[in-house]
């Protein structure tokens, strides 16, 4: 029995809690009186829109606004449902029913006891979007049984899935629920029940006459009692207990005394409206404008623009039809795209750059949409005025004009080696201008300009024309070997401290001690040249023959006699400078024409690659020679004798190369420590060579230098002066003989044959292994059983019993 009572008690508590919870979940109130609301958004396609709920009137005693309809496009309130005033002065604390129906023409509001109101809407030519709101500031104190379009609000906070429902500060429960009379009974009925109930003496302990008359409690006066709101404004009590006015659209101020439309004189029957405190004129259909001052004409009298406006509308300006373009378009017919919109077209010049359309863009007419032309303007860093960004950002390097033979670039001499290159236009004649200046304190600098105009243009060269500025050339003393790898068939231009020169007037030699410096080698791809001196009457004939440029007859003889592949490098790729402090250099300037031949022979025929260039160039070259090594040739020599001597020296050098292993550093790892010896002025032009040669001839042989380089590599203690020409290097010739080609082909065939034999042997061994494996597996798995084979053989030759007579079978 006790257990049964406990179960009943628990069940009763559960039912009571469930009922209370269901009541709480179905009742809602706004926790924020100033910002709480419930909003639906719908268009005319959702009409008619119906709903309803039960409510408790506002605790402020003011009229309770149950529903507000606002035009979403303009913000104008179209209509409201306000609860009618009851006998208690809007202080009734009981649940009342309310329902509504929204249509395109108006709002119908239904209240209990048959009360109803209707609000008509103004007609609109455009489709409307409605915003339906329940505001906490003027709305009901509590709500329950909310049903919209047959959908009931569920959850806490409430949730409705249709018409974009949103709610702010709307929560479950109601703090005023105890004061509401859910059964609809009034206080008078409660008094009557107490009056009819039996009187017990137990409760009459004190005589009523002794108590006297007690004054009923009175509420303090509302702050809005003395706060008047003009122009139908509504007085509200804030959370701080102060009175404030809620003004209608078109009015503002503390008491709604200011009319925002008072200063807007709408014309031609226009009505002033207000949206968020901003006044505007709502014009009749026949008028338009800010104050409805413009009257519409008939369509037949509408302005016609020729050509037709593509991205705008045709309007009358000063009595003339003109195109009024939309944003982003310009031109006479609005068919020119404004590419300067947003200054994105000039963003590559920085944030301060601005884009400006050309002046004629607003008058340009086009049949199709085109991009407008524009200019990018940037502020000048000095005076701040806007100039063309292209001119402001143009490179400041000095370029050589086609008509100028030479340009002096630099007047300021830095304390470190400088190499500046400026590109010359491709179509201009190629002009190589090298300007050198000196910074020696004891002797004024005399710039020497070397100009090599070329009549033949080679488009394959990467540097069609360039200007090189470098520091003065000075004599140096160092010993190093630089070997250029075969792929780099290039010229070498040395920037840094090099031998310097003096003017043509004789000067006294002066010794200037200069600390050791570092010479940097710059490589520019260019065509090799063969430099020759033209024979002059009564003078010595000198010819500088490139060691790797033999004639066609000599090439054929070398192909027949040579059986090995040789690779010969030009003279400037291998440089050795003797370190002798006693050597005194003399300098001069001489001008002579330079002849360059350019040929290409087929590799497949004689495996010879030769690159030469055919042009005649006047040039100015500076030669250097120690004072102790000066050679002069009295008798002129012929070119054939010199070439034969060169060929013999090449053969001797090849034998030395085959027996000695040459080790050299790559060109990118080569630096030459140089020193500055005495400077000697030489007034008389003469050719000076640092390498001693026989007196009968003056030659430059690459093979001799290479053999000396090998001896220098083997023994670093022995220092031998080497030939160093400041002129451009000769070409590089690769000789590949036919015997080497045949030997490499035979070796390739032998290797291929051996590979095929090995592959065939592997395939044969694999096949034998597979066959052996199959045979062994058949024996192991019973497929090859000798007993079974014997039984099958005997059964095949045995006579069946059907062919034997019955008597024989019985026997």
Curated annotation (Swiss-Prot):
Coiled coil region boundaries: none
Membrane topology listed for this record: Single-pass type I membrane protein
Cysteines joined through disulfide linkages: 224-235, 229-245, 247-256, 261-272, 266-281, 283-292, 305-314, 309-323, 325-334
Membrane topology (Cytoplasmic): 771-811
Range of residues in the leader sequence: 1-20
PROSITE patterns noted in UniProt: EGF_1, EGF_2, EGF_3
Principal place of residence: membrane
GO cellular component: axon; cell surface; membrane
Pfam families to which the protein is assigned, alphabetical: EGF
Low complexity bias spans: 626-639
A GO MF label: calcium ion binding
Keywords tagged on the record: Disulfide bond, EGF-like domain, Glycoprotein, Membrane, Repeat, Signal, Transmembrane, Transmembrane helix
Boundaries of every EGF-like domain copy: 220-257, 258-293, 301-335
Location of the protein in the cell: Membrane
InterPro entries: EGF-like_Ca-bd_dom, EGF-like_dom, Fol_N, Notch_Cell-Fate_Det
Biased composition (Polar residues): 570-579
Positions of the UniProt region annotated as Disordered: 544-579, 592-659, 690-739
Carbohydrate-modified residues: 90, 171, 232, 371
Ranges of Acidic residues composition bias in the record: 551-567, 597-612, 640-655, 705-717
Residue numbers on the Extracellular membrane side: 21-749
Record field: transmembrane: 750-770
Protein purpose: Regulates pharyngeal pumping during feeding.
Protein name from the UniProt record: Abnormal pharyngeal pumping eat-20
Species annotation: Caenorhabditis briggsae
């Amino acid at each position: 029995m006790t257990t049964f009572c406990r179960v009943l008690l628990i069940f009763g508590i559960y039912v009571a809690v469930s009922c209370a919870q269901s009541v709480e979940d179905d009742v809602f109130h706004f926790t924020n009186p100033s910002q709480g609301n419930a909003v639906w958004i719908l268009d005319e396609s959702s009409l008619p829109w119906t709903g309803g709920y039960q409510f408790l009137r506002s605790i402020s005693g003011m009229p309770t606004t149950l529903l507000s309809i606002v035009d979403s496009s303009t913000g104008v309130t179209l209509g409201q449902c306000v609860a009618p005033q009851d006998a208690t002065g809007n202080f009734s604390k009981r649940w009342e029913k309310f329902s509504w129906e929204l249509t395109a023409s108006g709002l119908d509001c239904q209240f209990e006891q048959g009360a109803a109101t209707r609000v008509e809407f103004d007609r609109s030519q455009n489709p409307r979007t409605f915003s339906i709101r329940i505001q906490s500031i003027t709305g009901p104190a509590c709500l329950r049984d909310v049903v919209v379009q047959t959908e009931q609000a569920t959850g806490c906070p409430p949730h409705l899935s249709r018409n974009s429902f949103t709610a702010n500060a709307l929560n479950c429960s109601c703090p005023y629920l105890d004061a509401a009379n859910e059964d609809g009974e009034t206080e008078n009925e409660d008094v009557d029940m107490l009056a009819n109930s039996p009187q017990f003496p137990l409760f009459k302990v004190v005589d009523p006459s002794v108590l006297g008359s007690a004054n009923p409690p009175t509420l303090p006066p509302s702050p809005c009692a003395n706060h008047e709101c003009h122009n139908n404004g509504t007085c509200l009590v804030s959370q701080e207990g102060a009175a404030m006015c809620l003004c209608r659209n078109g009015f503002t101020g503390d008491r709604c005394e200011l009319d925002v439309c008072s200063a807007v004189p709408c014309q031609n029957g226009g009505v002033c409206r207000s949206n968020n405190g901003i006044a505007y004129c709502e014009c009749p259909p026949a008028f338009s404008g800010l104050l409805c001052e413009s009257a519409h004409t008939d369509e037949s009298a509408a302005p016609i623009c020729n050509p037709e406006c593509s991205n705008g509308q045709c309007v009358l300006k000063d009595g003339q039809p003109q195109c009024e373009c939309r944003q982003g378009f310009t031109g006479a017919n609005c068919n020119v795209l404004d590419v300067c919109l947003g200054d994105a077209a000039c963003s590559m010049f920085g944030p301060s750059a601005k884009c400006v359309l050309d002046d004629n863009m607003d008058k340009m007419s086009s049949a199709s949409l085109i991009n407008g032309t524009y200019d990018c303007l940037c502020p000048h860093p000095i005076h701040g005025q806007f100039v063309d960004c292209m001119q402001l950002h143009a490179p400041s390097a000095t370029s050589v004009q086609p008509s100028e033979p030479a340009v002096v670039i630099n007047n300021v001499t830095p304390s470190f080696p400088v190499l500046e290159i400026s590109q010359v236009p491709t179509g201009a004649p190629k002009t190589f201008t090298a300007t050198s200046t000196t910074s020696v304190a004891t002797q004024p600098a005399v710039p020497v300009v070397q100009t090599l105009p070329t009549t033949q243009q080679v488009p394959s060269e990467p540097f069609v024309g360039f200007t090189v500025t470098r520091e003065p050339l000075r004599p140096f003393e160092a010993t190093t070997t630089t070997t250029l790898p075969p792929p780099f068939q290039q010229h070498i231009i040395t920037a840094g401290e090099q031998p310097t020169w003096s003017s043509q007037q004789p000067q006294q030699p002066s010794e200037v001690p200069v600390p050791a410096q570092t010479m940097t080698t710059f490589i520019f791809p260019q065509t090799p040249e063969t430099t020759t001196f033209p024979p002059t009457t009564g003078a010595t004939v000198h010819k500088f023959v490139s060691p790797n440029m033999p004639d066609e007859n000599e090439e054929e003889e070398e192909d027949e006699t040579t059986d090995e592949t040789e690779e010969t490098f030009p003279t400037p790729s291998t440089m050795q400078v003797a370190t002798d402090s006693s050597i005194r250099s003399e300098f001069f300037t001489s001008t002579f024409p330079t002849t360059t031949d350019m040929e290409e022979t087929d590799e497949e025929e004689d495996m010879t690659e030769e690159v030469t260039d055919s042009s005649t160039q006047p040039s100015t070259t500076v030669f250097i020679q120690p004072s102790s090594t000066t050679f002069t040739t009295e008798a002129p020599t012929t070119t054939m004798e010199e070439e034969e001597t060169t060929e013999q020296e090449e053969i001797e050098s090849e034998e030395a190369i085959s027996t000695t292993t040459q080790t050299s550093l790559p060109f990118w790892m080569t630096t030459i420590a140089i020193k500055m010896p005495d400077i000697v002025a030489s007034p008389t032009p003469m050719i000076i060579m640092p390498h001693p040669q026989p007196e009968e001839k003056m030659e430059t042989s690459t093979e001799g230098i290479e053999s000396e380089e090998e001896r220098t590599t083997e023994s670093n203690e022995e220092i031998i002066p080497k030939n160093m020409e400041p002129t451009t290097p000769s070409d590089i010739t690769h000789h590949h003989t036919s015997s080497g080609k045949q030997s490499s082909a035979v070796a390739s065939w032998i290797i291929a044959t051996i590979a095929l034999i090995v592959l065939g042997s592997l395939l044969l061994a694999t096949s034998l292994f597979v066959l052996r494996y199959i045979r062994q597996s058949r024996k192991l798995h019973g497929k090859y059983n000798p007993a079974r084979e014997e039984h099958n053989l005997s059964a095949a030759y045995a006579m069946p019993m059907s062919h034997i007579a019955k008597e024989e079978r019985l026997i």
